[in-house]
A protein has these predicted regions:
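Active-site and adjacent substrate-binding regions of carbohydrate-active enzymes
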Residues: 516
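Short, small/polar-rich motifs associated with maturation and membrane association
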Residues: 1-416, 421, 428-430, 504
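Surface-exposed loop/interface segments of Gram-negative outer-membrane beta-barrel transport/assembly proteins
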Residues: 112, 127, 240-362, 373, ...
């Protein structure tokens, strides 16, 4: 034996090095002053081999042998022993000073993941499974602090591909063994027997067990809806220990971009790149290069010159003074309607703002403008308890994540309550309920080169952030890239929001009239709602692409789904080596009972004040409903 492992509740795993052990020590990992305590660990079937016994608050511990026996040396007075084993309720035993020999009988807890797997509409011993099923332990899911279950599953199961949007909400795409043709290639998600659940509404801390059914033999019972694989989640239930356990789990942290952006040309380098292109046209083609709209033509030093003003073509400082009389007059001539919306180039604007020559030559770093270190936090309070007559569990969770792109965020509030009641040894009833409210903002669903991140490398670095009137620069600069700048796109979304509500509730009853026969019925409902609001600003005032009017868009929809599942299962065993399970069942579903509404109004006078973003405040001309 080279090392012994001890595990106690949420305590970390500890390893203790040991050398050669004499027979009278019987595998005890530590030798120190104090008394010797002998424990015998068993369950209703007999001794338990490999149970962990730890003296709470110390590194004194050991593992039970073939007889369920554990010997601990150096146990202090008034010690508390923590006895644990996978699949059983962890017990804490307070030792009296006179107690040197104790017996501990462990009670079975929830399904042990490595022994029993949830498949289809029941459970099965893992050794009896012939299909492809991946089991992910809750310990693995907790390894990384994440906001959603799908993020926690990444890299935990073979054959499961997960990609996300990169935003704080962690919107994901899950594929099991490739792409299918039904249900948009998405796998079927089953939570506590309820199908088609929104997994992002499931708090990862509420998960008790997780199985991924991957091949046809494992998913066949679900029919066509399981063609792309099935993910089965069982949430935490109460215990029959007779004790109440209250726990808190939380963390604070930060979210950062994995890299510092692309290695792009800065403002001065971009100008030199244009100059080299012109030289190549002249020297290798023998042609006169076309003047650049901003940098003009090559000067007598065979170089280009950074313009002072950009709109739509570049002007030097002397040209501005010649045309307007002075720089002050040029600034005073600014008009937000686009007829005279001038901007200084980023180089001159940064010099004006007090930056050094070296910094000004770099121009605008759009990546730095729109990225940040986001703050993240997650908190959960949970309650578990119960006894022989029933069990209960409840949890309250809160998640708040700032995205690494400014203005992006994700919040979730969740409440879960599960309970069972054993009326007698034949009849059990129970319920599993969960409600989650989520809010997210930023990105407006933009993809490709219209996204904030894509614009960090499509907008030229010589374009400034603001024009001389304080509005966003960009759309008036010829060859500046997209009309929108990355910063403008991000800031125009800072007051947008989308809110989701997900309510899932299931009630079940189970009758066991004779040995081996289980009759179960479960009725569940899922209520889903979505509300969103976004104001798109005008083209000129804030340089939005392709819009001459601002407009407010609001969306609202809700949907109610029903599911009724009935199963009869009979399990028997013969010749001690053969287990046979028969199951028949029916399932009725009704999806899509609900309504969706959308409205658009134009011409909001105070577009920068979200308090005025009310449909009735907009113009009814060309309105859309």
């Amino acid at each position: 034996l080279g090392a012994s492992l001890f595990l106690c509740g949420a305590s970390p795993v500890m390893a203790t090095e040991v050398g050669d052990l004499t027979p009278d020590v019987r595998g005890n990992a530590l030798q120190q002053d104090g008394r010797r305590v002998t424990c015998v660990i068993s369950d209703k079937a007999g001794p338990i081999v490999g149970a962990n016994v730890l003296v709470k608050g110390t590194t004194i511990g050991n593992i039970s042998d073939m007889d369920g026996r554990v010997i601990l040396d150096g146990v202090p007075d008034n010690a508390i022993l923590v006895v644990s084993y996978i699949g059983y309720v962890t017990q804490e035993i307070s030792l009296k000073n006179s107690q040197n020999n104790i017996k501990v009988k462990l009670a079975e807890d929830t399904q042990a993941l490595d022994e029993v797997v949830v498949v289809g509409y029941g459970t099965q011993a893992k050794k009896d499974i012939t299909g492809s099923v991946a089991v992910v332990s809750t310990e693995e899911l907790k390894e990384t602090p994440v906001a959603t279950f799908s993020e926690a599953l990444q890299g935990k199961a073979s054959g499961v591909y997960i990609s996300n949007s990169g935003g704080p909400s962690g919107e994901t795409t899950i594929r099991i063994r490739g792409v299918g043709s039904l249900n948009g290639s998405d796998p079927l998600i089953v939570v506590d027997g309820v199908s088609n659940v929104d997994i992002d509404a499931v708090n990862p801390n509420d998960i008790e067990s997780l199985q991924v059914l991957k091949d046809a033999s494992a998913t066949a019972i679900y029919g066509a809806q399981g063609a792309n694989g099935v993910i089965i989640i069982t949430t935490k239930q109460g215990t029959k220990s007779g004790r109440v356990r209250v726990s808190y789990d939380g963390y604070f942290g930060v979210a950062k971009m994995a890299n510092s952006g692309y290695d792009l040309l800065n403002g001065w380098e971009a100008m030199e790149w244009q100059a080299q292109g012109m030289r190549n046209v002249r020297d290798y083609r023998g042609q006169t290069p076309t003047a650049h709209p901003q940098f003009g033509s090559l000067n007598d030093k065979d170089e280009l010159t950074m313009p002072y003003a950009i709109k739509p073509a570049g002007l030097s400082k002397d040209q501005v003074i010649s045309q307007f009389g002075s720089i002050d007059a040029w600034v005073a001539s600014y008009k937000p309607d686009g007829s005279n919306s001038w901007s200084r180039s980023a180089y001159y604007q940064m010099l004006e703002d007090g930056y050094s020559e070296a910094e000004a030559q770099k121009g605008t770093n759009w990546y730095d403008m729109v990225t940040r270190t986001g703050k993240v936090q997650d908190h959960q309070i949970s309650l578990l308890g119960g006894g022989e007559k029933g069990t209960y569990s409840a949890s309250l969770g809160y998640t708040n994540r700032e995205g690494t792109i400014i203005s992006s965020f994700f919040k979730r509030y969740s409440l879960r309550a599960n309970s069972t009641y054993n009326a007698n040894k034949y009849f059990t009833i129970g319920q599993n309920s969960n409600i989650a409210v989520m809010e997210m903002g930023g990105e407006r669903g933009r993809q490709g080169d219209a996204s904030v991140f894509a614009q960090t490398y499509t907008i030229q670095p010589w374009v400034p952030v603001y024009n001389v009137g304080g509005d966003y620069a960009g759309s008036q600069a010829s060859e500046g890239g997209r009309a929108n700048t990355a910063y403008q796109t991000a800031m125009n979304q800072q007051d947008d929001w989308t809110r989701f509500m997900r309510l899932q509730s299931a009630a079940f009853a189970e009758l066991n009239p004779i040995k081996g026969l289980s009759l179960r019925t479960q009725f569940s409902v899922r209520l889903m709602g979505m509300w969103s609001q976004a104001l798109s600003e005008k083209t000129i005032a804030t340089n939005k692409e392709g819009q001459s009017q601002n407009y407010l868009e609001e969306n609202a929809n809700w949907r109610l789904d029903y599911q009724w599942t009935n199963t009869a299962t009979y399990k028997t065993k013969f010749n001690e080596d053969h287990d046979v399970t028969f199951m028949i069942g029916t399932e009725a579903m009704k999806f899509g009972v609900g309504r969706s509404m959308k409205a658009i109004r134009y011409d909001y006078i105070f577009e920068n004040n979200p308090n005025t973003w009310i449909l009735n405040n907009g113009s009814s001309d060309n309105m859309k409903n």
